[in-house]
Amino acid sequence: MPQFLDSRQPDFETAFTALLGAKREDSPDVDAVVAGIIADVRARGDAAVIELTERFDRVALTPQSLRFSTEEIAQAVDEVPAPERAALELAAARIRAYHERQMPQDADWTDDTGARLGWRWSAVSAAGLYVPGGLASYPSSVLMNAIPAKVAGVGRLAIAVPTPDGQVNPLVLLAAQISGVDEVYRIGGAQAIAALAYGTDTIAPVDKITGPGNAFVAAAKRRVFGKVGIDMIAGPSEILVIADRDNDPDWIALDLLSQAEHDESAQSILITDDAAFGRAVAEAVDKRLETLERRAIAGVSWRDFGAVITVSDLDEAAALSNRIAPEHLELCVSDPEALAARTIHAGAIFLGQYTPEAIGDYVGGPNHVLPTARSARFSSGLSVMDFLKRTTMSRMTPEALRAIGPAAAQLARSESLEAHGLSVQARLDRLNG
């Protein structure tokens, strides 16, 4: 049974604080193992990757077979039924159109001293995407990671997808093809992250690594950060639904279960201003759990981390939402835009009764790679910006240097950086001499 909280009860603040602080992820301490794997890949390259892949995925590879060939991808893609292909192509088109609008503009201007200033944006040269493997892997994650990279202008995009016992989801390869992925490698785990970061004879290194993974992948991403950029270290999925009584309890129950079925550590929370409606939703969840295919997972998540919170009004709901800073926030209320204006911390907001979070997972257009564990307080979901870097530009004319150079020389002397100051002063002396 989930927790039932009421903001009007005297112990509410204590209970709510405990809900916020609940540890939902039992991460094993794998750092030492991961450090060893990374060191091995750095030292032995392909040989280490091949050996580790055979040990963990039970697949015997050679340097030549690490990468899927064009023919292998084409053969797998041909197996995808037309309806699934059409759905992927629709999703890809919408994701691409949305992310194209995110592209920032370069800037270039001349200020009142005559100095020319500005910035330009450029993509990283190469990016690597990790895709959890097997037949249960998620092609939508390929689209959500790969398309922004390609829209940003990344020249080379490589994917690492483990193939346990030689199994791969053809939809993953189709998603890679649709997204414009350049290379697909049949490797996984910390060894894949190490290979992407440091390179081997077969796998050229990348500049940025994105994509979800298990504890070993997360630990590897932490360790290679600095050598390469990473997107984020994502935790278990979460959803917060703010709903009034003018909703179908079954719809809201399904929205809550849409995240609960991801992981036993996922969290689904309902905030409502109607206690009876909250109870009706909880009953609808229980009813759906009787038949849901992933009821074993969803049931544990709902029991251990689910919550129904009753508040006095929607202003209070917005305030609590900002404290939760959820990954996904659904606003199933009569005026969702007004409520959205008061909710400033959320990975993604879904407005109105006809915008279930699952639309955002697949075909809405915005990215589904989102900050978890309250990190929406300070971070954003994946976008083209994750694959871009801004370079500042400046050009001084003689007049501009005369105008601002003396201040630079003075500040350099104040910081006891003699050569800094002299590099400016030497030019000023010639201009003024």
From Swiss-Prot:
It comes from the Bacteria. Zn(2+) binds at residues 259, 262, 361, 420. GO terms for biological process: L-histidine biosynthetic process. The keyword Ribosomal protein does not apply. The active site is at residues 327-328. Its cofactor is Zn(2+). One of its GO terms (cellular component) is cytosol. Binds 1 zinc ion per subunit. It catalyses: L-histidinol + 2 NAD(+) + H2O = L-histidine + 2 NADH + 3 H(+). NCBIfam families: hisD. Catalyzes the sequential NAD-dependent oxidations of L-histidinol to L-histidinaldehyde and then to L-histidine. This is Histidinol dehydrogenase. The lineage of its organism: Bacteria, Pseudomonadati, Pseudomonadota, Alphaproteobacteria, Rhodobacterales. The gene is hisD.
